[in-house]
UniProtKB/Swiss-Prot annotation:
This is Survival of motor neuron-related-splicing factor 30. Keywords: mRNA processing, mRNA splicing, Nucleus, Spliceosome. Associates with spliceosomes. One of its GO terms (biological process) is mRNA processing. Residues 52-73, 149-198 are annotated as: Disordered. SUPFAM superfamilies: Tudor/PWWP/MBT. One of its GO terms (cellular component) is spliceosomal complex. GO terms for molecular function: RNA binding. Its main location: nucleus.
Amino acid sequence: MSEELMKQLSNYKAQLQQVEAALSIDPDNEDLLKLQKDLQEVIELTKDLLTSQPAEGTTSTKSSETVAPSHSWRVGDHCMATWSQDGQVYEAEIEEIDNENGTAAITFAGYGNAEVMPLHMLKKVEEGRIRDEIDGKPKSKKELQAEQREYKKKKAQKKVQRMKELEQEREDQKSKWQQFNNKAYSKNKKGQVKRSIFASPESVNGKVGVGTCGIADKPMTQYNDTSKYNVRHLMPQ
């Protein structure tokens, strides 16, 4: 999918360059200005899709500064951690610890989602439950799973909607680009219509069917009377 989007993005940029070149000659052309705006929008939408794709299915890493953890964690410990996708706190299990970078690889209990996050961001299970009680009624595992499913569903719907919008933009751009090319072709051909020699002349003196090399409306060439130079003139007297 990303390779296809890259090709389309390159094609949109090439079209935009041609439109901008045409605008440099005719800057007030409304059709060209509209086409330029539409191309810019579809380019931005395609870039957004390309940016969002690599983020899906990958683990998030947050490690800029190493901060001393408030608790001595060990592999297998259960903790409370914030899931990067929705910002909610869930119970997780520590799978691996990187003391050098001060990070831990964790897996959220009941979900199987794995992430890597700083050790100082982890909370003890008791602390997490106390915070839930302060914020409101603690959520059951079933409720948390339902929330996560709903979040994923909304995210998938949003992605499908964006893909539909992009497909519609592609079709619109395809149609507009064809119209633009047809107009340019018609403009180049303007004034090159050939007239038939049998076309009606525009003046009363013109003759139908007489080729005059593009001057059919001019009167026919006049010749002097040569009747005195007849055959008898050549015969001996």
